[in-house]
């Protein structure tokens, strides 16, 4: 799959002799990671999009928003999580230009909707990361697992009010960056022998502990000992962003950093071919749960997972394409009796409250009491939102909040059920 990406034009960094410039990141034991400067994901996406656009047979539908998956439920059948032979026939999709919900039928449906970062106040995820695919699959009675395993990246740029948070890549620490307190002292030696290159959960908890102990709002990442030419060569985007946003020259000044929600290790359960428990429905990328990352993903492994499982999904879907029949009586979306929402401020305020609940009670460090409080407060938001949703015509903010509520509920539910501290789940009440 990597050779395929290279053949598509992905420009991974190379050394002077032409060999690939492999780097080491947190939790890894060796230099094994291909990269493109400090924006590998963007480079892979650029190459893939260009390749897909070269096929005249592929249609792109931009400015659309998926609302719900179509299953037997929409044919009037009762569907539960225990219903055998559940099937997906496509999705109801909101056309943002016409504001009408359209019916997209498909013999194969793939969910590749990314993460859930927007349920937290501080996240490196884009604004669209509202857990849409996970929520849709959950409502369609798909199986979801591991939602308690939320990865917080230890080093997001401390820049209050900015969302999404800007990521200071793991590779900066891999290249020699050192975490320090505000007095300039190092602290990772108190937590792990691997120091600043320990796995993300350990580093994030260490930073959280130091901030609470000292009453500070961030720590520092020190790169002043790295030659400026190396910084400019390997981290041009990070250097430019720090300089533009905060006026910090990272070759001369330390970078203020703070943990931010970054990745979800759980999601929609899939098999080795990315198949869900709903026939003809696949999921790949961060919205899926392959089990590959266990309870704590290692840096950059998600890109490998995505390209491998997406390809396997493609192969299996082609193989099974002819087995899906399409019912003739699938109804169009029915919004009779609804009206345009007049109080969008309610949606905005509910979203803010949800983010606050998740950040304060379901963050890096948890307790049973915090989780119960989060559950109780989220239930009130759910009741209020459901009433508004049933009365209103579909809008993106309304749907995104619905998805965020579903996802937040799953995170809290799974966190309360998890009675062992492992990986990214850390509950103070479980310390023996």
Region annotations inferred by a language model:
Residues 113-123:
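Flavin (primarily FAD) binding-site architecture
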Residues 136, 142-249, 253, 307, ...:
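An anion/pyrophosphate-binding glycine-rich loop and adjacent beta-alpha core
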Residues 4, 10-31, 180-196, 207-210, ...:
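Glycine- and aromatic-enriched mobile tails/lids
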Residues 7-100, 105, 112, 156-159:
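Conserved redox-cofactor binding core of oxidoreductases
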